[in-house]
Amino acid sequence: MRSHSAAVALEGAPTREASRALLEQALRNRGSDAANLIVTVPAPVAPPDALLRAFPSEASILWDPPRSAACSGLGVAKSLAPAADAIAGFFDATDHVAGAASPSPRVFGGASFAQGAAKHLPWEAFGDGFLLLPTWTYHVDERAWLSLAVCEPGESDNPRLLEVFDTIWGSLERPIGVIPSPVSARRIDEADRGAWTEQVEEIRRRIREGAFEKVVAARHCVVELDTGAGSLDVLKRLEERFPGCTRCARWRGDAALLGATPELLISRRGSSVLSEALAGSTAHGDAARMMASSKEREEHQLVVQAILKGLEPFCDSLRCPREPSVRELPNVLHMQTPVEGHLREPTHVLELVRALHPTPAVGGVPTRE
């Protein structure tokens, strides 16, 4: 990626005028036959949801971990194949105009557990996998930055983009309104309890026969809210209820895949990688029973072993505690073991994702079955 620094005063709070001028200049300097362009300018510090509320119908991405920078996105400037070489090729043909200390551009992606799994409702809108660069990306930590990506050939509609910038800036400066009181919800469709019981018994039988070591069963449930609460309202409630979890969302048309997860599949910073096994659950007040349970311990260890096995080809060292700890969430307790490693050579994070996803914590052993 070709980076171009731009003079941006970082003393004090960023101003609309200075950031708008930088954006306007970068757009004006881009020719009709120019490469892809990403412009990153300082922005007001606000919750990542503030960008999404500026244009709710254009929301595309939210990534909001509890202890590091959050990102949100509007629109899709570029869809990429979920592969390391596709990402590298795109950024090699991209100019990045940014101020000092600005974050690097970021793409966002996701993948189903198995090829073809997205052929059925409710996953049809999302496909088996995706990788995208939002048109507008808001990065927020101690500082905040707003990025615009222009990837279409030909001259861009600069006046329209600047109008959108003004609307976004106004949303970032306004506090998010008070969320209404909790509303009731009712289930209108869920798996038959008898069929569910039969499925669980079948799983237990196959484990006894040695076909599987671990299986995570799942149920489909449709819930209807009594009010017209939207996806952004649900995400705000998740933030309030599960502050230690990562909020994430992907919008596609009228559909939204969203949640708040305590799990970390993989994090890579330089040559250091971090994963964790989060398997084994119980209610509050029952931690001692969970930690003493041979069943919970054995199933947890299957997840630890799978993560170690997946990372071993890439790492020259791996370490994890001998004993798991208890991870406390507002509604449940989990057994947790962090796994740290050091890469023997530079490795793209997508290769690590491919080696681990899905872990037995959310799937089973053996995974391919």
Give the location of each predicted region:
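Short glycine/threonine-rich loop-to-helix capping motif typified by GTGT followed
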Residues: L225-G230, L329-L333, V365
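Non-catalytic accessory segments adjacent to catalytic cores
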Residues: R2, A6, A88-H220, F314-D316
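Generic, well-ordered alpha-helical scaffold segments in large soluble proteins
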Residues: E202, R206, R237-R241, A306-F314, ...
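An anion-binding catalytic pocket shared by soluble metabolic enzymes
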Residues: P65-S68, L74-K78, R219-L302, P313-L318
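Conserved hydrophobic core element of enzyme catalytic domains
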Residues: V339-E369
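Cytosolic ligand/metal-binding cores
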Residues: M1-A34, E142-L172, A260, L264-P338
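A short, Trp-centered hydrophobic/proline-enriched beta-strand micro-motif
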Residues: D33-T40, S57-D64, R106-F108, E213-V215, ...
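An N-terminal JmjN-like helical accessory module and its immediate linker preceding a catalytic domain
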Residues: M1-A81
